[in-house]
């Protein structure tokens, strides 16, 4: 009985072991369909990598665009060859495919190859303009005939090749704007005082104006400027100086000026902000708000940041962008942190932010921090307090932070003894003054 029981146990264990072996083997052997899918994925990845696609982003790109696996690899390679023949730089080519993978359709590119090649050979349009036109047309289904007509109209207006390229690159939506609307826009600009000689410069600086309605946006915007108390000459001067003024939304400039009027800052900063006039100051606020919104802040938080840190209005846009990129890319914070710590944008990047971050990063790697230091703990402390907390206890941080020169003798602003020359002369007490004081004291007694 015991031997029979032993045999039964062995038989019972055997199928389980066999099943486990079969299951592990089947997990390593793909079905023909999955094997073909996996092989095609590898071939497509190798093809894209051969044309300059970075390996680090291939996995994410293919997972978002599974439809590319259903396309013919030969056709995909032909499409990549056509894009390369248009002399699009490798970085722009990768960006175009990542943002708009539909551009790899071979039938689409065959239609566009000849018109774009001809314009590129004659220098009419640049590679950046070709990229923008392809991306825009693949999304909304525009044909080459619209492109040829648009280029013809712009050239007939007397615009040079660089201006045509600039318009197509920054505002490819011009392909849908007809000739009558473009001429109407020119007449509007001439009517507000822009000289015809400056029209081309105007479109080169702000090509997006071609997509703004004359009756629905531009004329009501000018009426709003007049109602705010600005004269026609002031408006003309500001528009000629900065064409992007016409990109303001209705009600946007009053809101920016209201923010300036409610600022709580030192008088020196306020005077610097409005030194070039209220109109210009309001527009500078709009540019800073747009810059913050471009990186992900909602409009309300962007206004809040500018109101709490008015020095942002005085800084160049490039400096603000450098600080934001350092905050998000290097420090790893989210852009929304600026709503809580707007002071970050008001301090010097190289002199304060970078040294402090390097010290905190070093201490974090060495395990010298008991808790996580947020953006507020990094920016809020004064220079002396930060030094005493994080630098002075660790001698190796002196080199990272920059050694404080405590014993350096500070040069005096004025020569010694100057106070004696500036001291006002003392009043001499006469006998008459003494008599008057005695009389006053006696009257009190």
Curated annotation (Swiss-Prot):
Signal peptide: none annotated. GO terms for molecular function: double-stranded DNA binding; RNA binding. Its main location: mitochondrion. GO terms for cellular component: mitochondrion. The keyword Cell division does not apply. Residues 1-25 form a transit peptide. SMART domains: Mterf. Keywords: Mitochondrion, RNA-binding, Transcription, Transcription regulation, Transcription termination, Transit peptide. It is found in: Mitochondrion. The keyword Transferase does not apply. Disruption phenotype: Severe growth and developmental retardation. Dwarf plants with small organs, altered organ structure and nonviable seeds. GO terms for biological process: DNA-templated transcription termination; regulation of DNA-templated transcription; RNA splicing, via endonucleolytic cleavage and ligation. Belongs to the mTERF family. Transcription termination factor required for mitochondrial NAD2 intron 3 splicing and normal membrane respiratory chain Complex I activity. Essential for normal plant growth and development. Binds to RNA but not to double-stranded DNA. This is Transcription termination factor MTERF15, mitochondrial. It comes from Arabidopsis thaliana.
């Amino acid at each position: 009985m015991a031997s029979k029981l032993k045999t039964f146990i062995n038989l019972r264990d055997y199928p389980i072991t066999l099943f486990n072996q079969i299951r592990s083997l089947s997990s390593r052997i793909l079905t023909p369909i999955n094997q073909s899918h996996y092989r095609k994925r590898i071939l497509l990845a190798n093809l894209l990598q051969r044309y300059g696609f970075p390996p680090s982003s291939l996995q994410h790109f293919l997972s978002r665009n599974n439809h590319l696996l259903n396309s013919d690899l030969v056709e995909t390679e032909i499409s990549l060859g056509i894009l390369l023949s248009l002399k699009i730089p490798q970085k722009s080519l990768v960006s175009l495919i990542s943002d708009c993978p539909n551009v790899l359709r071979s039938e689409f590119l065959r239609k566009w190859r000849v018109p774009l090649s001809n314009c590129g050979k004659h220098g009419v349009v640049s590679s950046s303009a070709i990229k923008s036109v392809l991306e825009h047309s693949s999304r909304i289904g525009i044909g080459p005939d619209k492109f040829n007509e648009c280029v013809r109209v712009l050239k007939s207006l007397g615009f040079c090749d660089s201006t045509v390229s600039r318009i197509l690159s920054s505002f490819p939506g011009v392909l849908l704007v007809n000739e009558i609307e473009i001429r109407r826009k020119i007449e509007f600009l001439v009517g507000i005082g822009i000289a015809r000689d400056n029209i081309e410069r105007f479109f080169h600086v702000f090509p997006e104006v071609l997509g703004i309605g004359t009756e629905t946006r531009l004329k009501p915007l000018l009426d709003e400027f007049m109602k705010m108390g600005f004269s026609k000459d002031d408006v003309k001067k500001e528009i000629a100086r900065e064409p992007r003024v016409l990109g303001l939304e209705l009600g946007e400039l009053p809101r920016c000026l209201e923010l300036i009027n409610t600022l709580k800052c030192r008088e020196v900063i306020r005077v610097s902000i409005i030194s070039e006039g209220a109109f210009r100051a309001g527009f500078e606020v709009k540019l800073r708000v747009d810059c913050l919104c471009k990186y992900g802040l909602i409009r309300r938080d962007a206004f809040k940041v500018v109101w709490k840190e008015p020095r942002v209005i005085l800084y160049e846009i490039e400096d603000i962008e450098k600080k934001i990129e350092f905050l998000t890319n290097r420090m790893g914070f989210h852009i929304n942190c600026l709503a809580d710590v707007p002071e970050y944008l008001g301090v010097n990047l190289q002199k304060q932010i970078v040294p402090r971050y390097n010290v905190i990063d070093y201490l974090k790697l060495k395990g010298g921090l008991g808790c996580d230091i947020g953006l507020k703990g990094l920016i809020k402390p004064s220079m002396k307090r930060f030094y005493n907390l994080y630098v002075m206890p660790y001698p190796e941080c002196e080199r990272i932070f920059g050694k404080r020169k405590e014993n350096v003798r500070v040069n005096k602003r004025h020569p010694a003894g100057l106070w004696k020359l500036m001291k006002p002369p003392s009043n001499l007490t006469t006998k008459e003054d003494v008599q008057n004081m005695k009389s006053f004291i006696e009257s009190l007694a």
